[in-house]
Amino acid sequence: MPTYALLGATGATGSAILRCLLASPPPDLDLNILVRSKQKLLKSFPTLTTTISPRIHIIQGNSTDTIALQQCLEDASVAFMCVADNASNKGVSLTADTVTAIVTTLGMLRKLHGSAYNAPTILQLRSASLNPKLSCQVPRLVYNIVSFCLHYSHLDIVKACEHYEAAAAKGLLSYIYVDPPTIHDAFGPNRTGHKLISCKPDVCDKQETALSYADLGAGFVEIASRKEDFLNQPVGVTATGKAKETWGVLAGFLFDGAKGRARAWWEEERPMSKPQNLFLYCGM
């Protein structure tokens, strides 16, 4: 019987994955869920306490707590890694810190189980902006604006990916990077259809601009069922129907990220005199 682990089930992505698994669970599935607040999870999903299929095991703890992670990852063949920080500020490291703790925990489990250890496949939410074969489909101005505003969040994810790749080389895990476009309609339950995009070809299939969280969650679940097709690779997810677009929310994230970049610039340049700052900023 398979065991899945879900890290971060109260955010938009984790909630979408959980809704999909509850609606159509794989046969005989055990689902370990790691959350900071069990109360918050049950408020969103009150039926979890009586759900029979899949069998639910809720672990309350921080995503960097190796004891909680060991309970969550024990016997898991697939782990959905949805822990992230929406704030793109200098020094953000939640994703990388969580992955570091995951790798440490898997090392403990391999030492505990020895030759019986089975390396799980970690499905990591990433972004099409970090996938050259998908980002090349985006107008350069849009790509540059997004990359500027989400710079620190992207750095956090890139560092996390470096940890995955080093751990995979040691046989601790396999990974799959899940690369959506802009994601909309957080916590909306309605799916309109999705398709996976293989990034093996030199030229990928077209990725639509907007994808709903509900369809992203379904994409994650499909990738888990087809993990052998995508091991240690990125895979795109695109919409096949019309997603409910919530550009105002995304604009807010970009604006906050731009403020984070400006704040970091100001902190770095503050010791200098104002005239020097102005000259450097203008390229003089």
Swiss-Prot record:
Disulfide bonds: none
Entry's family note: Belongs to the avfA family.
Stated role: Averufin oxidase A; part of the fragmented gene cluster that mediates the biosynthesis of dothistromin (DOTH), a polyketide toxin very similar in structure to the aflatoxin precursor, versicolorin B. The first step of the pathway is the conversion of acetate to norsolorinic acid (NOR) and requires the fatty acid synthase subunits hexA and hexB, as well as the polyketide synthase pksA. PksA combines a hexanoyl starter unit and 7 malonyl-CoA extender units to synthesize the precursor NOR.
SUPFAM superfamilies, alphabetized: NAD(P)-binding Rossmann-fold domains
Keyword Zinc attributed: no
Residues carrying sugar: 62, 86, 190
Taxonomic superkingdom: Eukaryota
Induction and repression of expression: Expression is positively regulated by the dothistromin-specific transcription factor aflR. Dothistromin biosynthetic proteins are co-regulated, showing a high level of expression at ealy exponential phase with a subsequent decline in older cultures.
GO molecular function list: oxidoreductase activity, acting on the CH-NH group of donors, NAD or NADP as acceptor
Protein name according to UniProt: Averufin oxidase A
Pathway: Mycotoxin biosynthesis
Species per Swiss-Prot/TrEMBL record: Dothistroma septosporum (strain NZE10 / CBS 128990) (Red band needle blight fungus)
Keywords from the named record: Glycoprotein, Oxidoreductase, Signal
EC number per UniProt: 1.-.-.-
Signal peptide (from-to): 1-23
InterPro entries (UniProt xref): NAD(P)-bd_dom_sf, Polyketide_Oxido-like
